[in-house]
């Protein structure tokens, strides 16, 4: 459901809330110190926090276009299940963002990677159980 919402630009970013005329004190990204509106592209690709997270996965990309960035990530991962990794990693970034906004827990690239590993291990276990 998460990635379906992301692909259709329906994930509850601050930009989407602004477009839906919801008033917030700020529409800037909560995960970085830049005064940049929190868009999907920013949150998952160009945000300094997101880039630090991707770096923990040994993925570096310079593209800001989402489709070209996906191609760069695919090339660097060299795995047939690269989309599973991308989806789970975006989910981990999203959860870090939500923990900060709703619980006041500062985002951490290390915790993002740790959460990704836990989620990925669960995916592997479910796949083996079938």
Would you name each region that the model predicts?
Residues 40-46, 58-62, 106-107:
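Short cysteine/histidine-rich zinc-coordinating motifs and their immediately flanking basic loops
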Residues 1-37:
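Helix/loop segments that flank and initiate small ligand/metal-binding modules
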Residues 32-36, 50-53, 97:
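Cys/His-rich metal-chelating microdomains
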Residues 90-104:
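K/E-rich alpha-helical interaction surfaces of small helical-bundle regulatory domains
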Residues 105, 110-130:
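C-terminal domain-tail junction helix/linker
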Residues 16-24, 37-41, 76-85, 101-111:
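Conserved, non-catalytic sequence blocks in retroelement Pol enzymes and Pol-derived host proteins
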